[in-house]
Amino acid sequence: LPEQIDWRKKGAVTPVKNQGSCGSCWAFSTVSTVESINQIRTGNLISLSEQELVDCDKKNHGCLGGAFVFAYQYIINNGGIDTQANYPYKAVQGPCQAASKVVSIDGYNGVPFCNEXALKQAVAVQPSTVAIDASSAQFQQYSSGIFSGPCGTKLNHGVTIVGYQANYWIVRNSWGRYWGEKGYIRMLRVGGCGLCGIARLPYYPTKA
């Protein structure tokens, strides 16, 4: 495995987005991984529509939260997802619009529970969605450096791991580019279930 990887430097990650006051982190983290695997497979980096998931993925709950697996399943069952340009983000749930199927995926896989080595293996291949406990003031007010807590393991926020170094994960948040390190946070790698539960619920999409 590479000692370090940063998918941003490989051109596989879109600019940081902002979910606003809508609890749609699940859509942002899912879409982020789909954008990345599509770029890795096709060479085209296309910003995709979180709003389509918020409006149309009825197994999830729009601005009231959702699960990665249902979001991936929606994209698979729907035959693809539209672009951000065609179906822009509104930060409120609305009626499902007719949408183009611009980027598709074949499936999704989970990473073994609380296995940081397996998570590193996954991220070496592509960015992965993870759920974390983002409820601490220290997390919310993070501005720079390697974050080491405090935080619990009550999973309440979906984010994307886009790379790693020997001692930290490079994590893409959806709170805009003025949060953290231009929208990112470096989270200490601690083994096991990970800091803030980061290794408890990782998934990634598959695309041939």
Swiss-Prot record:
Signal sequence interval, chain numbering: none
One GO term describing the cellular component: extracellular region
One GO term (biological process): proteolysis
Regulation (activators, inhibitors): Activated by thio-specific activators such as cysteine, beta-mercaptoethanol, DTT and glutathione. Inhibited by the thiol-specific inhibitors leupeptin, iodoacetamide, PCMB, NEM, mercuric chloride and sodium tetrathionate. Repressed by the active-site-directed cysteine protease inhibitor E64 (L-trans-epoxysuccinyl-leucylamide-(4-guanido)-butane) produced by Aspergillus japonicus.
EC number: 3.4.22.-
GO MF term list: cysteine-type endopeptidase activity
The protein's name: Ervatamin-C
Biological source species: Tabernaemontana divaricata (Crepe jasmine)
